[in-house]
Amino acid sequence: FHGGSWYRFPWGY
């Protein structure tokens, strides 16, 4: 995802 951003999950892919 964004590498550390709360997009849809807290771990941030």
UniProtKB/Swiss-Prot annotation:
| Localisation | Secreted
Major place of localization?
Answer: secreted
Query: Could you tell me one molecular function GO term of this UniProt entry?
Result: potassium channel inhibitor activity
User: What's a BP term from Gene Ontology annotated to this protein?
Assistant: envenomation resulting in negative regulation of voltage-gated potassium channel activity in another organism
- Recite the UniProt keywords alphabetically: Amidation, Ion channel impairing toxin, Neurotoxin, Potassium channel impairing toxin, Secreted, Toxin
Q: What top-level branch of life does the organism fall under? A: Eukaryota
* Record PTM Tyrosine amide, positions in chain: Y13
Record GO cellular component, one term:
extracellular region
Tissue specificity here reads: Expressed by the venom duct.
Function as written in the Swiss-Prot or TrEMBL entry: Inhibits non-inactivating voltage-gated potassium channels in rat dorsal root ganglion neurons.
What else the UniProt entry mentions is:
The mature peptide does not contain cysteine residue.
Protein name in UniProt: Kappa-conotoxin Mo1659
- Organism source for this protein? Conus monile (Necklace cone)
